[in-house]
Amino acid sequence: MYLKHIHLYGFRNYHEQTLDLQSQKTILLGNNAQGKSNLLEAVELLATLKSHRTNRDRDLILEGKKTGQILAMVERTYGESELGITFRSPGRRSLMLNHENLRRHLDFLGHINAVEFSCLDLDLVRGSPETRRSWLDTLLIQLEPVYASIIHQYYKILRQRNALLKVIRKTVEEQENSSNLSAELSQLKVWDQQLAEAGTRVTRRRYRVIERITPLAQKWHQEISSGTEILAINYLPNIKIENEDPQQVQQAFLDKIEQRRMAEQQLATTVVGPHRDDVEFNINHTPAKSYGSQGQQRTLVLAIKLAELQLIEEVIGEPPLLLLDDVLAELDPNRQNQLLEVIQGRFQTLITTTYLHSFDAQWLNSSQIMKVEGGKIAQL
């Protein structure tokens, strides 16, 4: 997999910029707030249709513009593909593949794969459960593009069920006609079933991906820590499951919904389902979030990112792109060397940095070095 070029128009702080990628390794050099991370964000959007920095398309469009666009050419073993995303404010984004407009996200996803590693990824360990759920979902979308539709459908059902729970609470509080309440409770049973079915599809996939990535991350973690630390990754689903059998998982959903029915009606929100899942990271049997040093947390995240690269390559049959956003400065020399040694010429890599002294001469000589300043990119 090779990203040959990328063109940005009205995206973030770029008026119009084309970058031809002529090396397996591209170093983007520049001060902060010049546009280095914006370029990596564009690649992330091409891979996942998501940004880890914002949920609003308006934020992706250059100030004063009504549209922004990312165009790219990617080369795979089966041939070349031209990808395009157009953002509108107001309006919905549109997707393009080989000059044809696409109606479904599913048809766009999977043409380019990327793993991003930035200093923000420490939030994976010390941040909220929402951060860890988002990490799982982003990984799953790249491994199985149909997952984007599965998770979208789940949250759509969740919103509709929550709306009905609010109506039910209002009916109870205002002591309205009991026949209205009876009809609403019957309707809730229908949403219970839909939530359990959609939630089962999400839970089973999250369960499986944790099972697959854990041994890979443990292997990398052993290597980076020189065998002094033991990593454990535990999926903490909101419902108790023994295995990923779909019937058992779905029944566990329905049982817990029944147990929490009164609480949900009082709170007027759904408290059962994968939107309440979490992932736990332990180092030497101790929660990394609470007790891990910053060095241990960085080692953990680096191991996970290397495991992501390995897992995606195993599943899709080609190495994904690696996006390193000002991360070398956050790593000590040992971890820097581990990371750079793994990359070598195996993964096409885009690296942002404010200085070059983290790289040895051999790395610099084999890299394309670009200067980024004020939304403009030029060969150094």
Swiss-Prot record:
InterPro entries registered for this protein in UniProt? AAA_GajA/Old/RecF-like (IPR041685), DNA-binding_RecF (IPR001238), DNA-binding_RecF_CS (IPR018078), P-loop_NTPase (IPR027417), RecF_2 (IPR042174)
Alphabetized, the UniProt keywords read: ATP-binding, Cytoplasm, DNA damage, DNA repair, DNA replication, DNA-binding, Nucleotide-binding, SOS response
As for subcellular location, the record says: Cytoplasm
Please tell me where this protein is predominantly located: cytoplasm
| A Pfam cross-reference name | AAA_15
Q: Which domain of life is it from?
A: Bacteria
Give me the residues that bind ATP, please: 30-37
Query: What Gene Ontology cellular component terms go with this record?
Result: cytoplasm
CDD domains attached here? ABC_RecF (cd03242)
UniProt key word DNA repair: yes
The processes (GO biological process) annotated in the record are:
DNA replication; DNA synthesis involved in DNA repair; double-strand break repair; SOS response
Q: Determine if rRNA-binding is one of this entry's keywords.
A: no
Q: Name one GO molecular function term.
A: ATP binding
Protein's job: The RecF protein is involved in DNA metabolism; it is required for DNA replication and normal SOS inducibility. RecF binds preferentially to single-stranded, linear DNA. It also seems to bind ATP.
So what family is this one in? Belongs to the RecF family.
Protein name (record): DNA replication and repair protein RecF
